């Protein structure tokens, strides 16, 4: 990989034009610019495609509705365009140094294959934002790490080397819109992929997923569905143990209706 790796940012989007406009504006304000921003139009009927093009993003279309089909389509598009594939969602609001942190991390550590971070919820009540950050996302990180032995890849805030996606792209259940795309990806990863969680890599995201009991419950129950379709690969006892010479730790710190606008991701 060159010293300055090429970075592609992938954004799956379905009928989220207003959020997408703010997200793309935040990407335009990055201290380190992406080489390409890829917006995957997932059969939108609003102005999402027009918004993406107004920001000079590359627009690709995925007619199969669902986050996993859309995200996978974007990762495929990025394979020949980038060394690092970064991912966020239309309602993400990346801090100005988000891409710079990603690039610094991957350049400084060749063993790093996937880097993910946490969330800062906006738009909800203080209680909703707190529960979203510490119970929904924080709890997911805690329990998935204990079960799988690697950090949970958070779909609204992560990046991976292109070679990692090239290895797993035919193994993930990419056409299944009824499972968590990021959890399914996590299940297909191994310690040897160099998966790390950086607690300082935080992403403002909409509180829409935690603003209704039904929306939150649906997402929690999808965890079971995701493990079910991947079984037994997601079984804790089948996970590869780290070798004695493994150089990576799990943390790095720098010196469907899933698209329903009411609920968000």
Whereabouts are the PLM-identified features?
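Glycine-rich, basic loop-to-helix element that forms the pyrophosphate-binding segment
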Residues: 62-80
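Short beta-strand-to-loop acidic/aromatic patch adjacent to the donor-nucleotide binding site
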Residues: 81-93
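Acidic helix N-cap motif at the loop->helix transition within catalytic regions
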Residues: 18-21, 46-54
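Short, well-formed alpha-helical segments that are part of the catalytic scaffolds
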Residues: 15-29
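A conserved acidic beta->alpha catalytic loop
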Residues: 26, 33, 41-49, 92
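Acidic donor-binding loop at a coil-to-helix junction in glycosyltransferase catalytic cores
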Residues: 176-185
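Conserved donor NDP-sugar-binding/catalytic core segment of glycosyltransferases
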Residues: 97-127
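Short, flexible, basic/aromatic active-site loop/helix in glycosyltransferases
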Residues: 117-121, 131-151
